[in-house]
């Protein structure tokens, strides 16, 4: 995709120093030619040389889409991959070790509902059919008022929509994660409405920013970050970006999402970022950056308003606050 006008999130001059360091590692991996070494080391832990080598064999790092840049440093990898929400494995942030129980190969994905032909295929085949991998730099804003900036690898969600060939009456895309209490202790907690479900309008799903991520930091997605395939919607609060997706259902009814079922007054369907609409229990005016701990002012739509604000024009003329929780 070629964008002549510099997007609102792009830096005016050069990229952040940490991004240069990251790019140097990417180029070194390419030059080293790991793909011919026949390494079979499993991906373990949260980083390291062995993981990077295996990633190179599996097609990572993906080519960078330079239309998507950052206005801040990339978050250190260890912070982004060890401070995570994944309620299937517990409510603490330090669940990355527990999440390694998730088996992501093989991983079957179903596309059903209001489509021309329902299909079931493995995640790798799905991504292949949806187009080649690319890498994008996105900001990520959690509803809990922390944030990170990371390089995601994956494909535009619009490509999956095109592949699915939804019927004219389809208005929404519902996404569902795995259900396996034998490995995910959080799913044994019956007061949660498992499995985790999220949804978008088709207009949102086909927006240029909506992304299906399969990797991060130039490597396949770690389990704790939502392997093998997750949603990334950078203009929305992070709970909208459902992890470890097993089903895409096209429907004419607005999905009732996981957190909306639990407390729709605090975690609604739209969940767009807005610093001037507080959470009922805390302010959203600022965000704490993982890694540096620095507090910065939150931006409307997380800084992506130029690309997405038009999706919501006139939707709630009497109370647009519904769009921001």
PLM regions and their residue ranges:
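Structured, non-membrane catalytic/scaffold regions adjacent to prosthetic-group chemistry
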Residues: 54-325
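Serine/threonine-rich low-complexity intrinsically disordered regions
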Residues: 6-8, 12, 44-50, 110, ...
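N-terminal secretory signal peptides
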Residues: 1-27, 36, 41-43, 51
């Amino acid at each position: 995709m070629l964008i002549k006008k510099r997007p609102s999130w792009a830096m005016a001059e050069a990229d952040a120093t940490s991004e240069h360091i990251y790019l140097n590692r990417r180029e070194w991996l390419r030059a080293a030619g790991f793909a011919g070494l026949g390494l079979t080391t499993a991906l373990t832990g949260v980083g390291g040389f062995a993981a990077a080598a295996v990633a190179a064999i599996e097609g990572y790092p993906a080519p960078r889409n330079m239309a998507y840049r950052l206005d801040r440093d990339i978050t250190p990898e260890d912070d982004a991959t060890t401070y995570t929400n994944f309620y299937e494995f517990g409510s603490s942030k330090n669940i990355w070790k527990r999440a390694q129980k998730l088996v992501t190969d093989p991983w079957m994905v179903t596309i059903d509902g209001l489509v021309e032909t329902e299909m079931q295929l493995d995640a790798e085949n799905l991504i292949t059919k949806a187009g080649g991998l690319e890498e994008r730099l996105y900001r990520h804003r959690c509803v809990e008022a922390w944030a990170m900036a990371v390089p995601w690898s994956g494909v535009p969600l619009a490509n999956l929509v095109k592949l699915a060939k939804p019927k004219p009456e389809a208005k929404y895309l519902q996404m569902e994660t795995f259900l396996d209490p034998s490995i995910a202790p959080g799913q044994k907690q019956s007061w949660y409405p498992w499995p985790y479900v999220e949804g978008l309008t088709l207009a949102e799903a086909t927006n240029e920013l909506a992304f299906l991520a399969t990797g991060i930091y130039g490597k396949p997605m770690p389990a704790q970050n939502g392997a093998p395939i997750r949603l990334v919607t950078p203009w929305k609060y992070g709970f909208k970006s459902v992890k470890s997706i097993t089903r895409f259902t096209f429907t004419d009814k607005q999905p009732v999402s996981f957190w909306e079922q639990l407390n729709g007054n605090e975690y609604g369907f739209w969940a767009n970022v807005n610093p001037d609409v507080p959470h009922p229990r805390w302010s959203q005016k600022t965000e704490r950056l993982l890694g540096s701990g620095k507090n910065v002012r939150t931006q409307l739509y997380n800084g992506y308003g130029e690309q997405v604000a038009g999706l919501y024009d006139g939707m709630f003329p009497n109370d647009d606050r519904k769009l921001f929780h």
